[in-house]
Design a protein with these regions (language model features):
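Short, solvent-exposed loop/turn segments at the edges of extracellular beta-sandwich modules
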Residues: 1-3, 100-106, 202-208
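Strand-loop-strand motifs at the edges of beta-sheets in extracellular beta-sandwich domains
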Residues: 63-86, 95-96, 167-189, 198-199
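Extracellular ectodomain surface segments
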Residues: 3-5, 9, 18-64, 86, ...
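Short, solvent-exposed loop/turn segments enriched in Ser/Thr/Gly
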Residues: 34-40, 77-79, 90-96, 137-143, ...
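Acidic surface patches and DE-rich sequence motifs
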Residues: 60, 74, 101, 163, ...
């Protein structure tokens, strides 16, 4: 018979906060002692509709290796991740970056691996200072140096020395072990006096080096006369 009836009603779709989506970062590699920044970005369908903003945060699994901090740039979903690599440290750490919206109830996070590659650090030669001795008197002094790589990389340290006037003073060195100590010996030539420059160098197993130049003053000493045989 084709009889019918109809009714119109309204369906209200309530808004639900959507989680932001963090753009993939990927694993990172850097050399020891080098800090760097990574640009962060994320998207959120609610930003334009609900006037939301995004905030970044980050954490490191090993703060003795790398410290992390973030800065949010405006409301457009961009930011900066700063990786502060600690001095003379190498290895790997897991870094977790999180982005949250202004409602604070939804977030997205990503974890990546930061690998810090070891770099040879040059040794440091302990200051020696100028020296004074008398004519005809040989002597020795202890010389020392340090190297942050000695314990971690099993490095050894070797000393060498050069005199700019071997007619006045000749020099030689004896290197110790990996503790970075040695002996510098001065062979003062007979009946000679004056001032000579001595250059001392410390070298590690990977070729890193440090040098210092100092002066040795040889003071004259009165020599007794020699009577010719009669």
């Amino acid at each position: 018979d084709g009889g019918s009836a109809s009714e119109v009603f309204e369906l209200t779709v309530s808004p639900v906060n959507d989680a932001p989506i963090l753009t993939e970062i990927g694993d990172q590699v850097t050399d020891e002692d080098i800090d760097f920044d990574i640009e962060l970005s994320a998207s959120d369908v609610d930003i334009d509709e609900n006037d939301q903003s995004l905030t970044y945060s980050a954490s490191s699994s090993d703060e003795s290796l790398v410290l992390v901090s973030t800065e949010t740039l405006g409301d457009g979903g961009t930011g900066t991740l700063t990786l502060d690599v600690q001095d003379d440290r190498n290895g790997s750490a897991e870094v977790t970056v999180t982005v949250s919206d202004s409602q604070g109830r939804t977030l997205d996070s990503e974890t990546f691996t930061l690998t810090v590659t070891a770099v040879n650090d040059s040794p440091i030669l302990t200051e020696i200072g100028d020296q004074v001795t008398n004519e005809d008197e040989d002597f020795s002094i202890v010389i020392t140096g340090t190297d942050v790589d000695v314990e971690t990389d099993g490095q050894s340290l070797v000393f060498s020395a050069v005199s700019n006037d071997e007619s006045l003073v000749m020099v030689s060195t004896t290197s110790g072990d990996s503790t970075g100590s040695g002996v510098l010996t001065f062979d003062v030539q007979d009946n000679q006096n004056g001032v000579v420059s001595i250059a001392v160098t410390i070298i590690d197993s990977d070729g890193g080096s440090a040098s210092e130049v100092f002066e040795l003053t040889v003071s004259p000493v009165n020599d007794a006369p020699i009577l010719t045989e009669i």
